[in-house]
Amino acid sequence: MFQHTVKAPALFAGVGVHTGAYTRVAVRPAAADTGIVFVRTDVSGSDNRIAVSPEAVCKTQLGTVVGNAAGVTVSTIEHLMAALVMLGVDNAVVEVDGPEMPIMDGSALPFVRVLDRAGRREQQAPRRYIEILAPVEVIDGDKRAALRPAEAFEVAFEIRFGSQAIGTQAIDLPMDEAAFRDELADCRTFGFLHEVEALRAMGLARGGSMENAVVIDGDRILNPEGLRRPDEFVRHKALDAIGDLFVLGAPVVGRFEGVLAGHGLNNALVRALAARPDAWRVRTFAEDLAEAV
């Protein structure tokens, strides 16, 4: 019913999957109604703060990047954002001393663990959520993403790849903190070997390895340990979508549907929703309780 922040700083460090740069991160407590704010501690002055919002998303190639008017950015935020929203952390200041969040093991599980160690503190402000009132959909060829009214948060996703290592996979899950922990948090990002080589030629994927991603070569999975789940690929895409939705600034009560969607389409959906005030409203759990009495 109430907003929460972290009880103590959540500290972690690692390499960025694209920059290869080693960065240190501290997720610190923040006042009620702050939302999620990234602070680049390696940038001096007042231009180092980035308040997360749909408009702050400035790039979506292979990850979600947020930035401010001064051009200061932080990339690959989606896994941490998914962990924050699903663990009920509404307000936090995320200090990072470089341009990219650490990829850790490629999933959200390391973030869940550090947030668990930090704990959560209840704040004296009602927790808000975004209730979906009418369907909103964006389509790009055979790709689509949609938000529809529902009694609770639900996530459905479908992917189709020519590689037999992936094929067609689909999930449809009611999503709360327990489901996120049990069904999605440990599912890793993935990529094809030939794409990794091309990305590195473009200056990307410099930190990518089988330590932080599932790597596919043709129809083979190269990671010696294999998959954590048979449908790990589609589950990770659902994890990404949850993180991308949280740039709205509050959890969603509604049904998300994604077909072949990526970060770009997810953000297009968020912006389309924001542009449709008839399709959503901000509610608080306190209001719901009062109406139920």
From Swiss-Prot:
Pfam families: LpxC. GO terms for biological process: lipid A biosynthetic process. Keywords: Hydrolase, Lipid A biosynthesis, Lipid biosynthesis, Lipid metabolism, Metal-binding, Zinc. One of its GO terms (molecular function) is UDP-3-O-acyl-N-acetylglucosamine deacetylase activity. It catalyses: a UDP-3-O-[(3R)-3-hydroxyacyl]-N-acetyl-alpha-D-glucosamine + H2O = a UDP-3-O-[(3R)-3-hydroxyacyl]-alpha-D-glucosamine + acetate. It is an enzyme of class 3 (hydrolase). The active site is at residue 263. InterPro entries: Ribosomal_Su5_D2-typ_SF (IPR020568), UDP-acyl_GlcNac_deAcase (IPR004463), UDP-acyl_GlcNac_deAcase_C (IPR011334), UDP-acyl_N-AcGlcN_deAcase_N (IPR015870). Zn(2+) binds at residues 79, 236, 240. GO terms for cellular component: membrane. Its EC number is 3.5.1.108. Its cofactor is Zn(2+). Disulfide bonds: none annotated. Catalyzes the hydrolysis of UDP-3-O-myristoyl-N-acetylglucosamine to form UDP-3-O-myristoylglucosamine and acetate, the committed step in lipid A biosynthesis. PANTHER family: UDP-3-O-ACYL-N-ACETYLGLUCOSAMINE DEACETYLASE 1, MITOCHONDRIAL-RELATED. Belongs to the LpxC family. This is UDP-3-O-acyl-N-acetylglucosamine deacetylase. It comes from Phenylobacterium zucineum (strain HLK1). The gene is lpxC.
